[in-house]
Amino acid sequence: MKRTGKAAFILSACMVALALGGCGGGGGGRPPVAIPPPPPPPPPPPPPPPPPPPPSGGLNDAEYQASNSATTASALSAYQAGATGKNVKVAVVDTGINASLPEFAGRIDPASQDVAANRGIVDHQGHGSMVSGVIAANRDGIYMQGVAYEATILSLNVGDPAGCKPGTSDCFFDSALPVAIDLARTNGAKIINMSFGDEEGMPAETFAAVKRAVEAGIIVIMSAGNSGTAQPNSFALKNVQDAGSTGLFIIAGSIDANRSISSFSDRAGTGIGANHYLTALGRGNATVNHTGAHVAVNGTSFSAPTIAGAAALLAGAFPNLTGAQIVQLLLTTADDAGAPGTDAIYGRGILNIAKAFQPQGATAMAGSKEPVSLSDNGTVSGPMGDAAPNTGGGAIILDGYSRAYVLDLARTLGRVPQERPLAQGVSGGNFRTAAATSGKLMVAVTIRQNRDGRPGVETEQLHLGHEDGRRARAIAGMALSRLTPKTALAFGFSQSAHMLRQQLAGRWDNAFLVARDPMSRAGFHPGADTSIGLRHHIGPIALTVTGERGKVHMSGLRHRLDRPAYNLDSLTFDGKMGPARFSLGASRLREGTTILGARFSSVLSNGGSRTLFADGTASLDLGAGLEAYAGYRRGWTSMPGTSSLVEKGRLRTEAFAFDLSRAGMFAAGDKLAFRVMQPLRVASGGFDLEMPVGYDYLTATPRFERRFFNLAPTGREIDYEVAYGLGLLGGHLDLNAFLRTDPGHIRAMKNDMGAAIRFTLER
């Protein structure tokens, strides 16, 4: 073949150990001419103290740490995900490769050949071996590894058999270039690396061959050049102008170890090339030359294979990706550098393999269109405590590129904030209740004073004027009317139906601050809007019917309208037989989008729930002011299957309390009480999942297995509280001490204990 000297590879002066000369593609517009090496760098500053030695085991070992092309691009997480570039063919159009080097053993494609002569698979000049080393040097525990260390190299030697023209890197036959590019296309290359450029233009045949390659879906990585100019070399720009719309070109610029643009690197420019320009390490890249020597080399010649290796990792890990998608991923996940957005220096930014491997765009469960979050798919409620849903090895999700990932759904579930029952119990100090009666009607309003101590009324609830609203806030109210001697009706706003039921029955228990009545809670903080109660006596037994409508209080949702709704309807029988009192009740709780206050995304279950509670209480007057009490609640919750993933589920819950109290313990009018209580807890249950656990890229179908999503905790909160009350000095003195084990039904939580002293003046 005729040597015309139009192509110039990136480095001819970097074939000795720790070489300092620059290497890269060129600029200009003449037949294949060598690109001059960059000027030598200024003397380096004094070196910093050596870093600590890298870990000795695993993928993050000394060999990886020495592979600065990979480390600078943050490749470790891709390796940890199993990506190696295996079975991905990268064509290196260069000066050949030394096939005897162990760095490439078993991974040189049989179609590799000398396109410029008949020398066999050899590399007399070293540039091709060094470029190939950056891409795919073996991970063998010696020196360094390539970015895609299991990729296959299709080596296409276009080097001049006579060597480079003296004093230049003019080493290629122009007529060999289109032949080599066509061979890459016809032999199944996924990526073509071209670490060369030109000064005065390439023949039309070369550009036509490149266009045929990208039209076949092959990624083409080209060096920007080493002239330090404001634009990439003309070979790269002409290719982008001819076929850039295919989205398969990347122009590789160089950064140094400090992630700054290399002084010798041609920049992105302000033209069409900037959108295709990506930087990667191009100074001091560790690799091997054609003799097997360990060398450090400079030039955009080595930025290009770093990016080619990244593309090979993506292609091997995600076989569904097209070449254009791989290029788009590399460009859109680059770290922004220089001016915000695409700029004239760094173009799209700095290569970041870790980001390219992260899910991009909207994520959905494989086999469905159900959206799934990577971080927040719900919040378990208090009764679920430390429940650990069994999702096995995780669920398969697809990102916006239909790439399959394993997501541990359990790790995307949060917990409701831990309750602070003592703080909540004593916060009632700034409340007072005002009541008025007229005949058979009684009206009561609970007032919370403002910070200045003056009473204040919430205008949106009571529809008062602005001045009245400034002074007081009514937080709850009730109107009770006795319809007949045996029948009473009550209405409430911002007051629970449980409280209405107690008031209708004439019983009130507020001795305990922490171990509160477990029958009053359904597993979440209710925000009652309205409530109604009707009580009717039938001989010695009374029937109470109540209804409540409200919103589930959820952390982070400040506006009440955003909170999920619930309805709670109850039927209770209570009576007295001698010294004993009893009650039996049933309640139906309907939640619009929550499950006992737990919030789940649509991929799990956001269709709400239905819960039936059965309650029983009994108290016995033991005489001498001594009274015993026991209460038990059992709940059954059903959850509809609202997605293709979730089938119907059920929960079984329970709560209980045992009290012992004595009036007149130490003085007339005092009372000492002790309670043991378990808040509502999921005893068993969850829902069944038809979970995607595998994915076949060939058929684009997931493999499903049945998994159980457990919502029962391992922890069990038990509250112990002692309370003492005494009328004193025109007021009331209350002393409380408590212990909570496994707070929030979380076994790992430390026990919570405390005490409170309160003195309340009678108003």
Kindly label every feature range from the protein language model.
Residues L59-A70, S74, D182, A189-N193, ...:
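C-terminal subdomain of the subtilisin-like protease fold in secreted/lumenal serine endopeptidases
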Residues L660, K671, K750-R763:
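Outer-membrane beta-barrel "beta-signal"
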Residues V134-I135, L156-G159, K190, L281-R348:
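Hydrolase catalytic cores
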Residues W508-F524, T544, H559-R563, S570, ...:
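Outer membrane beta-barrel transmembrane domains
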Residues D94, P102, N239-A312, G316:
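Extracellular S/T/G-rich loop segment that most often corresponds to the catalytic His/Ser-adjacent loop
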Residues P51-S56, L76-V90, T95-A111, N118-F173, ...:
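Subtilisin-like serine protease catalytic core
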Residues G24-I35, T84-G85, V158-T246, H290-A304:
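Substrate-binding/access-modulating region of protease and related hydrolase catalytic domains
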Residues G24-N87, P102-E103:
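Protease zymogen maturation seam
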